[in-house]
Amino acid sequence: VKPTYSPPRAFGLGQNTGVSVKRDSLSLSFAVGVYGAAFGAASVAAHFSVLQTCAISLLTFSGASQFAAVGVVGAGGGAFSAIATGALLGTRNGLYAVRMAPLLKVRGAKRIVAAQITIDESTGVALAQNNEKDSRTGFWWTGFGVFIFWNIFTLIGAVSAGLLKDPAAYGLDALVPAAFVGLVWPRLSGKRSYYLAAFAFVFALSLVPFVPAGIPIISTALLAILMGWRA
């Protein structure tokens, strides 16, 4: 049986109407956006410039993919491994788009904008509502909210880390795994997902001594996709 790709509705949001949808969307946007500071600092610690770091957030705008790609580069991996890792983790956003397209019913330039902000949070808030109007409101407010806060905090984190002579000496490179776990943990639901996450973690660690940087993450992502597809 093929799985249904709906993002978790575990963001602490229930079914709301009108103003409450916007309020919850902005609250969630700020909470998620703060992680952008961790990405900004981690990216600079991995020897990306402030400009490059901000460009990654503006153009990629996918937290897990960004942290994974920067982590690969920071560990000594090549550009191909970093891009492949980020792309694999970002495939879920494409699956969300399939779910959201009939609901949003957008075309032209608006469709391109919608694609950029189709993420876990915007899709999750949209699907948590009980009518199409509130769903669309939740999607747009959350999507734009996270985008704005994420990029603001990315800049703050990058500039702050850039003021340090050696960001890695302050342990900022540890922000990548810590923030990655922080992003993933709320999305786990049920014993099966926890078991799969634990197995993937052990599997990735077991590969580290034997393969180049980036390959463990790519292999783990492929394993997770395979397990999810067979569920």
Predicted regions and their residues:
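Membrane-embedded alpha-helical modules
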Residues: D134-S219, L226, R230
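Short, Lys/Arg-rich, polar N-terminal cytosolic tail immediately upstream
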Residues: V1-V21
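Pore-lining transmembrane helices
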Residues: K22-A115, K133, F149, P216
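Short acidic/polar alpha-helix capping motifs at helix-coil junctions
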Residues: Y5, T17-V19, V32-Y35, I148, ...
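Helix-loop-helix junctions within the multi-pass membrane cores of secondary transporters/permeases
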Residues: G14, I83-D173
